Amino acid sequence: MLPQDPVILLSVLNTKLRDKYSSLMELCDDLDEDEASLLVLMDRAGYVYDREKNQFKPSNS
């Protein structure tokens, strides 16, 4: 289960994406998480997924 706090979630996701998963889809499949819901949650917190860099970044950058 992933943390609900957006700042902690950001850290966990980016760490997992860097260390273990080659894509958000792979992470979501392995952790049984809904990718679309996760993207919406992170967007509401001000972050977007950068597929090229395989990490979440602030939406204003």
Predicted features along the sequence, with ranges:
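Short alpha-helical "recognition helix" segments of helix-turn-helix
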Residues: 27-28
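Generic serine detector
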Residues: 11, 22-23, 37, 59-61
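N-terminal acidic leader/helix
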Residues: 1-24
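Short, charge-rich amphipathic interface segments used for partner binding and complex assembly
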Residues: 32-60
